[in-house]
UniProtKB/Swiss-Prot annotation:
Function per UniProt: Functions in the determination of disk-specific identity, downstream of Hox genes. Overexpression induces ectopic wings with antero-posterior and dorso-ventral axes in the eye field. Overexpression is sufficient for ectopic expression of vg in eye disks.
Reported tissue expression: Ubiquitously expressed throughout the larval and pupal developmental stages in larval tissues and imaginal disks.
Protein name as annotated: Protein winged eye
Biased composition (Low complexity): 106-122, 948-973, 1020-1040, 1057-1070, 1346-1361
BAH domain location: 1510-1634
Polar residues bias (residue ranges): 612-637, 650-662, 1411-1423
This protein's domain notes: The BAH domain is required for localization to specific sites on polytene chromosomes.
Listed Pfam families: BAH, BAHCC1-like_Tudor, SH3_TNRC18
Keyword tags: Chromosome, Developmental protein, Differentiation, Nucleus, Phosphoprotein
Gene Ontology cellular-component terms listed: chromatin; histone locus body
One of the GO biological process terms: positive regulation of heterochromatin formation
Length: 1658
């Protein structure tokens, strides 16, 4: 296909990304050329897993040098439902394969580098054209058999059985497989022969979920390259199942599963090759293995030492192969690859899992750096981690290291992060100590320099991917197993720049989560090989200058002991020490050797590894291996507290530091930028003081920081690392403080979190660095935090932590959160303070600020600043201004430059004794107490000043502490921080979810929860700087989300300063954030300075969980997509918000909008008009009165705002408040919309609204606005106690200002001044009070009335920073402003004149209103003024009105009728204009709705109308106005009355007909007869003239008697009629009642009587 040199600009990532239908993989044909000298000393891991002698055949080395730059593109064709098969036509491949086998044999003999070299030769010698075909048909049995040659069938685990399975029994023993040369024939699960790939072992072959196959590792890559020309390839054995299958099901359970098993990852459906080891992997391990993806180390130049390339490749391949028997555990996926079982103990197969499922594998090939952008289809690409796997050939130990690296890589894959695997030959264990090999590696590591560009790209995606990977089921990030025999394996180191002197390959495992899946244990074996599998948290260490992590791990005889420590992910043949158990014995022996071995260069790279990967190593490191890279990894894994171990690499590090310091810084910076949050947890306990090697040799305080995932401290250190001062300078003090804090945290944090990791933040600067990454990691000991140098302590805490980290899903990612770059450590420190502020804000940040401002707080701040520098806590509260502390810290930082950092960290940790830790904790407690007091006393202005000063101080201190190189790092970090800050999508975007949970599990939670003192903010900062959102959500301080209410962003920020601070990594962004926070705080505290904090706290408590869920936070602003509701014209539209140019410009694509046109909005608009889309989970979650919006119909895209109401049922014409709608329909909620409509809405069509969202007025006709307002007011008022209106204060159980109004009115109270005022207030509101209300609403209504709506929620919102303008605006929108005034007056002092019930309600309302108003005296005073004004205006109105009308109206209103409102609404009635005002009818009584009526047409019905003293009720008869017919008025029976949505009062009338209007009616004796008819009409209520009576004839006759004179004037002054019968005007059918007398009957009767009398007389 195509080969290119790493030097070429083209990158593998580009190539990979470019592929679509066919995926092209760049397979490095050879390792980078390296100086043969470098290779000679290193022991190398045979690709088969065997350990080979450090020396490699010269030819191999030479070949390596030649072929180091060539890459092979492998094209994979994808066909539906088929798995890729890679075929290549290369005679070269066969030769290579044979050569590889030969080399493997040689390696068996002790030349591990030979195989590596051979593979690299093959790769380089020929361009491999590999086509991967996906074929539906399964390979024939015969072909398979031929291809496998009785080798372990790799595809046996596939869902569909293949003939290969028959071969399985033959290869039951892992030993058999590795030993068999036929393994060359072995087919991949993918049907790709390792030989085809040109690699003897599959260690370098990576299969991406996309069906892409990649080879990695120098020699391995070469072997994989396609050396199998002579091998018969069988058709692809892939299964054809398109659907994803759980990995566990795929994994073979057979005891003798030497081959790799083909499995699909359930989540992504990607194909994963899992090594089938003699020991079955735990399901979680298998899952981890499946998830793990290691970037081919071949991409990284790997020829530092003779055989170094092969060692590196082998290490990379074997990194997943913990046991020396790499052959049993195929170097990579293909067990056959590992041919020498005899040489190595059977490694766990989990480690063989080098295939990383990645939807897309993007590789950037550069001479020194390979970046694999593992973009998983299912997981967001945003979380990309760079896995640097430096495999150093160093005998057996290298194998262990390789396994460690591989495990790290698998962990990385879990994070779906990019991994750079640097395969570098390492000298044998003795060589480890020697600097020269490391130097060779340095040359070979130009890659770190290349990394910087990659970092930016990766930075954004790493976190997310890492998080996604973290989700993988396996607690151990990597399935790799580390054999105990690997104990001697050199610790993996992160190489940030080619400068790394240590030859040991370092695998940067970004994705390693707390489980410490990497084989840091192997890392501690630096003596054997410096290859350190470090889980580097790209996010946390932005500054390359923190290489100190690469603490040198002296290679002691005990290096081999390192295997004891094992990662959760690592299965070791030898008993694995429990997580809590430290490997002091093994670690200790290693310490000296490891310490000597790691070069400063490694230390710097280790900074990159700042995440916990070193932790795994660190347990080993515990014996002072403190390899810089190991330590950082361990620090992340263990607790990222092993920074001190970094100093361990004294002589070697010191030497290397000079060489690699600059390069490492660059690499670190790049890695930091990449900052993938991967925080492996080390399960091995390390003894705290074991790796006593003083970090002094290394001046890399920054490295220490990196080792400590907690960023806050690392940035500080990074700034200073350049200067090399006494190793312990101020570090001892800081460490002591940090340790003390850790102890304190452990106690508190353990209670907060199940895991002891809560201590994490407190460790020394190392701890600080680790805290962010390892807060969850720190678990076992408070002292361990300082002791990354003390490997054992960390391991124990790490192991405890490991569980928490992995348990959160991949909380290790949290460690990654620590991603805040070391360069940005200073900046992040500031964010930490901010977080602190946020925390304090949730618990009193304002007072905290004041405290900080105060001298006391300054002193405390000084302590905390020292902590910040040396411990993750980096308390914001601490004032760094203290001159002594600053000078001490500066000295310490300068003393600890990259080379000294590790030693420094170790020394500090060692120095840190329990007493110091206790002292630190004491100081912290005192500081917190004082700070709280100060907070209470402090005022808003003071708080502002304090916050500004604090920010400035922090920045100044950070700058002072930071050395110029650090500052250089800091600039990118600042940029990153700005990105990561409120505007930083990387951190906010990636870690909001995982991070929060992880942090909660960590000590972060404890800090914020218990106090806002320095420890919590620093820990948050460190862990959150990159994944800021995570810490926010995870820790209590985070718990106060940076929910931004509409146009209340300031308030939200003020509420959750922690989040903001977390997001801001850089000092510049910190300043901006600080100023913003100040402004927000100002707004929030406008009402009152002294009581502001209390008020805010109360408001927060009142703030419903719904409001918090709905508010946008800074984290949401950086997510790729966020479901939101945006307010447009009073209606809400659901859509997806995406950042265009965060943090300023965003786009919202509304659902169902034509063409998916996006609306571009500014940050301000987003925060003001947008809320998160939250659907209620159940009807119970929508209590009556809840503000919500709902889809009226599926056909409409908009959601109408409204509120939940009680479902009402009409019973006998009366409205009764029925049980909540939930009782009748579980999934329906009765909703009253702001436009007056109501209905029962299905739960799925409802979305939550902020409780203080104002009632929008929908006035189709402005002329009806008055009536509309009244109508809504009436509706709300008459809804009864059960009803809830937004405008009144919250009453327990129901909030309805109108409810008390209607209740009060219902009583027969005498007219009172209050009633009069209410009446006139209502009438004059639009006129004179309108302006005054607008002016005063800000002060009064904004607080009190608006608050009434939420029952204090508004007040809380105001206290939280809702602007007065917003409150005023909201209040102005309320339809029931009149009621508001009335309500306020009632609350004032006139309640006594109201009914008892009313008093109760108003009293409750008053309490609700005055609770906030008492907190804000200004609001109270303003309200009083408004009331006074209202009274004055009412008096004026009184003069305008006639006394009679006024009194009648007042009396009516006192009785409870809302006539006044209806009089005001006369404009809504057409006839009203022709009637005197006092003759207008108004509703009387409570409105009701008929059950069963749905939709907008649902009306508010009333039983009664009233005018003055007259009342007419449904069922009554009335005379209607008519012209020209005084003798025959229109008379009808009132059937029903209601108010329309436009405010009109309508009456339905069943008309009566006069006899004159009928046809065929006989002459009736008595006038006043009426006939019922089916004729009904709807008329305006105002057409009713007056009430009349329509009686049965008997009653009528009894009333008037037989006197005919009475009947003559009946039409003149009598409104009594009788019902004579029924008439149908349409049919003209009349039915006369039987008892109705007619004139005809009378005549007949008279005649009969006369005749009778005459007869009698006769």
């Amino acid at each position: 296909m195509a080969t290119f040199n790493p030097g070429a600009s083209s990158s593998a990532a580009d190539v990979l990304s470019a592929t679509t239908a066919t995926a092209t993989f760049l397979v490095p044909t050879t390792a980078a050329v390296s100086h043969p000298g470098a290779h000679t000393a290193h022991l190398q891991l045979d690709q088969f897993g065997g350990f080979s002698a450090a020396t490699a055949t010269p030819l191999q080395h030479h070949h390596h040098q030649q072929t180091n730059s060539s890459y092979t593109f492998v094209q994979i064709k994808r066909e539906p439902c088929q798995v890729s098969e890679i075929s290549s036509n290369n005679c070269h491949q066969q030769q290579q394969q044979h050569h590889q086998h030969h080399q493997h044999q040689v390696q068996h003999q002790g030349l591990s580098s030979a195989s590596m070299t051979a593979s690299s030769k093959t790769m380089s010698s020929s361009t491999l054209t590999t086509l991967v075909k996906i074929e539906a048909p399964s390979p024939k049995v015969s072909e398979l058999e031929k291809s496998t040659g009785n080798s372990v069938p790799i595809g046996i685990a596939v869902a569909r059985k293949r003939p290969q399975e028959a071969l399985v029994p033959a290869i039951n023993t892992p030993a058999t497989l590795p030993l068999q040369p036929p393994l060359n024939k072995d087919l991949n699960c993918f049907g790709i022969r390792v030989a085809d790939l040109g690699a003897t072992s599959c260690g370098n072959l990576y299969f991406t979920g996309n069906g892409d196959l990649m080879t990695t590792g120098t020699a391995t890559a070469e072997e994989l390259a396609l050396s199998a020309a002579g091998v018969n390839r069988a058709p692809s054995t892939f299964w054809q199942y398109p659907n994803a299958l759980p990995i566990e099901s795929v994994i073979s359970m057979s005891p003798a599963t030497v081959g790799l098993q083909y499995s699909r990852e359930a989540s992504r459906g990607q194909v994963v090759l899992l090594p089938a080891g003699p020991t079955a992997l735990d399901p979680f391990q298998q899952a981890a293995a499946a998830a793990a993806f290691v970037w081919p180390s071949a991409y990284i130049p790997q020829a530092p030492a003779p055989g170094g390339h092969s060692a590196a490749a082998a290490a990379a391949a074997a990194s997943l192969q913990p046991t020396p028997n790499l052959s049993s555990l195929p170097n990579f996926i293909f067990p056959s690859m590992g041919g020498h079982q005899a040489l190595s103990t059977t490694p766990s197969y989990a480690s063989t899992l080098q295939l990383y499922l990645a939807a897309a594998a993007t590789a950037t090939g550069s001479s020194t750096m390979c970046q694999h952008s593992n973009q998983q289809t299912s997981t967001t690409t945003t979380n990309s981690t760079i896995n640097l796997s430096l495999a150093a050939g160093s005998g057996v130990t290298q194998s262990g290291n390789a396994a460690s690296s591989l495990s790290s890589s698998s962990s990385l894959s879990a994070s779906s992060s990019r991994f750079l695997s640097l395969a570098t030959g390492q000298t044998g264990i003795p060589s480890l100590l020697s600097l020269p090999p490391p130097t060779g590696l340095k040359e070979e590591y130009p890659m770190p320099l290349a990394l910087p560009p990659l970092v930016p790209l990766e930075a954004a995606r790493d976190k997310e991917q890492a998080l996604n990977l973290m989700r993988l089921p396996t607690p151990p990030t990597s399935a790799t197993m580390e054999p105990s025999s690997l104990g001697h394996a050199t610790p993996h180191h992160l190489f940030q720049s080619g400068a790394m002197a240590t030859p040991t390959p370092a695998l940067l495992n970004l994705s390693m989560h707390g489980n410490g899946g990497e084989l840091p244990a192997a890392t501690p074996l630096p003596a054997v090989s410096d290859e350190a599998a470090l889980n580097y948290k790209l996010h946390a260490p932005l500054t390359p200058q923190t290489p100190p992590r690469l603490a040198d791990i002296p290679v002691s005889g005990s290096t081999q002991l390192l295997p004891q420590m094992q990662d959760v992910n690592i299965q070791t043949d030898t008993p694995v020490c429990s997580e809590d158990e430290s490997f002091p014995g093994s670690a200790k022996p290693q310490d000296p050797a490891a310490e000597a071995f790691p070069p400063p260069t490694h230390v710097q790279p280790l900074e990159l590894t700042k995440p916990s990967e070193a932790s795994h190593t660190q347990p080993t490191e515990c014996h002072t291996q403190t390899e810089p890279s190991d330590i950082p990894s361990a620090s992340q894994e263990e607790s990222a507290e092993q920074t001190p171990p970094e100093p361990i690499e004294t002589m070697t590090q010191a030497t290397q530091a000079d060489q690699t310091s600059p390069e490492d810084l660059t690499g670190l910076e790049l890695l930091s930028n990449i900052s993938t949050n991967s925080k492996p947890l080390v399960r091995v306990k390390q003894e705290p003081v074991e790796h006593i090697e003083q970090p002094a040799p290394q001046p890399q305080p920054v490295n220490i920081m990196p080792s400590e995932p907690t960023l806050p401290m690392p940035p500080m250190l990074e700034m200073e690392p350049t200067s090399e001062r006494e190793p312990l300078g101020g570090l001892k003090l800081l460490c002591a403080l940090a340790e003390q804090r850790i102890q304190e945290e452990v106690v508190q944090g353990s209670s907060l979190f199940a895991t002891p990791s809560s201590r994490t933040p407190t460790p020394t600067s190392l701890a600080l660095g680790t805290t962010a990454a390892t807060p969850p990691i720190f678990e076992a000991k408070s002292c361990y935090a300082f002791g990354q140098s003390q490997g054992s302590v960390f391991p124990s805490s790490t192991s405890s932590f490991q569980m928490p980290l992995s348990s959160p899903g991949f909380p290790s990612m949290q460690g990654i959160e620590l991603p805040t770059t070391s360069a940005g450590i200073v900046a992040e420190l500031t964010p930490v303070k901010r977080k602190k502020h946020k925390h304090s804000k949730s618990s009193g940040s304002d007072s905290r600020k004041s405290a900080r401002c105060s001298k006391k707080s300054k002193k405390k701040r000084h302590h905390s600043s020292s902590r910040q520098q040396f411990s993750a806590p980096a308390e914001e509260d601490l004032d760094l201004q203290d001159d002594q502390l600053q000078s001490e810290l500066r000295n310490a930082l300068h003393a600890v430059d990259p080379s000294y950092a590790q030693r420094f960290g170790q020394e500090v940790f060692s120095i840190m004794d329990n007493s110091m830790r206790m002292r630190l904790a004491k100081i912290t407690r005192q500081y917190r107490k004082k700070k709280r007091k100060l907070d209470e006393i402090s005022k808003h202005k003071k708080k502002k000043k304090c916050s500004k000063q604090q920010l400035e101080l922090q920045q100044q201190q950070a700058s002072q502490q930071a050395v110029q190189p650090s500052s250089a790092l800091q600039q990118p970090q600042m940029t990153l921080s700005s990105v990561l800050g409120t505007s930083s999508p990387l951190r906010d975007y990636k870690f909001p979810k995982f991070s929060s949970s992880n942090l909660q599990a960590s000590s972060f939670l404890r800090f914020p929860d218990k106090t806002h003192s320095f420890p919590p903010p620093p820990s948050l900062q460190q862990s959150q700087p990159e994944p800021n959102p995570l810490p926010s959500s995870s820790s209590p301080s985070t718990s106060s989300f940076v929910r931004l209410e509409p146009s209340a962003l300031d308030a939200a920020v003020a509420i959750a300063p922690t989040t903001s601070s977390t997001s801001t990594s850089g000092s510049p962004s910190t300043k901006q954030v600080a100023s913003a926070r100040k402004q927000r705080k100002m707004k929030a505290s406008t009402v009152g300075a002294a009581g502001e904090q209390t008020a805010a706290t109360e408001a927060k408590r009142r703030f419903s969980a719904i409001d918090r869920e709905l508010q946008l936070t800074s984290e949401h602003l950086y997510r790729d997509e966020t479901r939101v509701l945006t307010d447009m014209g009073g209606l809400f539209y659901a859509g997806v918000m995406k950042p265009l140019r965060p943090p300023d410009v965003y786009s919202i694509t509304l659902d169902g909008e034509r063409g998916n046109k996006s609306h571009v909005m500014s940050r301000e608009d987003i925060l003001k008009d947008t809320i998160l889309e939250v659907a209620p989970k159940s009807v119970e979650s929508v209590p009556v009165g809840t503000r919500l919006c709902a889809y009226w119909s599926q056909q409409y895209r908009c959601l109408y705002p409204g509120r939940a109401i009680d479902s009402e049922q009409v019973v006998d014409g009366t409205a009764s408040s029925a049980t909540n709608a939930a009782t009748t329909a579980p999934d329906f909620v009765s909703v009253e919309f702001d436009d007056g409509d109501s209905g029962r809405i299905r739960l799925q069509n409802i979305r939550m609204l902020l409780s203080d969202y104002p009632i929008a007025e929908y006035n189709d006709n402005p002329l009806y606005s008055v009536g509309k307002q009244k109508r809504s007011a009436l509706r709300g008022g008459e809804s009864g106690p059960g009803g809830v209106t937004q405008d009144h204060l919250t009453v327990p159980g129901c909030e309805d200002s109108h409810s008390h109004h209607s209740l009060g009115m219902s009583s027969d109270n005498t007219t009172s001044l209050a009633a009069t005022m209410e009446l006139f207030t209502q009438r004059s509101e639009k006129k004179r009070l309108k302006k005054s209300l607008k002016k005063m609403s800000k002060a009064q209504n904004g607080v009190s009335p608006a608050t009434a709506t939420n029952g204090g929620a508004d007040a809380a919102a105001l206290g939280d920073g809702v602007s007065a303008e917003d409150a005023a605006r909201k209040h102005h929108k309320h339809k029931k402003r009149k009621k508001h005034k009335k309500h306020h007056r009632k609350n004032g002092s006139e309640e006594q004149e109201q009914q008892v019930v009313q008093q109760d309600y108003s009293a409750a309302g008053q309490e609700a209103t005055e609770a906030p108003s008492t907190e804000m005296s200004s609001a109270t005073s303003s309200r009083v003024k408004v009331e006074v004004k209202v009274k004055t205006e009412q008096l004026e109105m009184e003069e305008e009105e006639s006394a009679s009308n006024l009194m009648s109206e007042i009396s009516d209103e006192a009785k409870g009728d809302d006539l006044v409102e209806h009089n005001n609404s006369k404009g809504s009635s057409k006839i009203a204009a022709f009637l005197p005002e006092r003759q207008l009818w108004g509703w009387y009584g409570t409105a009701y709705r008929k059950a069963g009526v749905k939709g907008r047409a649902r009306k508010q019905f009333y039983k009664t109308i009233k005018r003055g003293k007259e009342t007419i009720t449904v069922g009554d008869s009335a005379v209607f106005l008519s012209t020209g017919r005084p003798d025959r008025p229109y008379i009808g029976r009132i059937e029903s009355m209601w108010e329309t949505t436009t405010g009109n009062k309508v009456v339905r009338v069943a008309w009566f007909y006069h006899p004159e209007e009928t046809t065929g009616c006989p002459k009736l004796k008595f006038p006043g007869a009426l006939f019922e008819s089916p004729h009904e009409d709807e008329n305006d209520v105002q057409t009713i003239s007056h009430r009349c009576e329509v009686l049965q004839f008997g009653s009528y006759f009894e009333k008037f008697g037989a006197d005919s004179k009475q009947y003559q004037s009946i039409y003149d002054n009598n409104d009594t009629y009788y019902l004579a019968g029924h008439y149908n005007p349409r049919l003209q059918v009349l039915k006369l009642q039987d008892d109705i007398p007619t004139l005809e009957e009378l005549q007949d009767t008279n005649t009969t009587t006369t005749t009778t009398e005459t007869t009698t007389e006769d």
